[in-house]
């Protein structure tokens, strides 16, 4: 579902006075295989509304500070948001599949042996009435401590990827992370996070028709208020939908994408959705 993208394009043009570019941002860098023998290995489990992911990376130290090198990523397309956003409860069958997946992730964590790992759940688990019950089951059956984080904490973690390193000293940007259940916006001025907020707008919610006009209005109002006196803001995006557009455009990670390129891609894929 690419519904958020046209809206973002129109808003950038109408309100931000930005250049005709949206820049997808990726905090994980690539490195030669020879570097894989160095550094410290960490792992993370991300329980999203559209999928679950287990991610391994190594942290290498150099003259510019720590560099995060992607080592491996496993994705399980278990859409918790389908249940959570339509019925308010994660079904028994989905819960069973969820726990089975966590067992598999735990086995891989043991095999990779990182120095530490953390597991977090976001929008779907926040909304599900039985979210905490499922957290307890995961702990009892797998030993994994799964943390359901708030939208505010989710935004904080996203901005902690040190995006400021990739910005010029006086560059202003609106960082947009589009997930399955929520979208996190962070306004960065002169390499400092000035404000951030999470909104209940995401690809799964849109597919399930769970996003209201009030949700869109709330996001627009926040952006207008926070950027009223700021000009030349560049949009920087991340998330599965934005990544997919990058792939369809045959762009390499970190490259700029023009608004016209995104509009052209949307026109091509609309007949198939």
Regions picked out by a protein language model, each given a short descriptive name:
Residues 40-62, 67:
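N-terminal basic/disordered segments at the start of proteins
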Residues 63-71, 192-194:
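Beta-strand initiation motifs
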Residues 42, 56, 83-114, 119-172, ...:
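Helical "lid/coupling" subdomains associated with nucleotide-phosphate turnover
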Residues 46-51, 176-182, 238-241:
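A short acidic Gly-Thr/Ser loop motif
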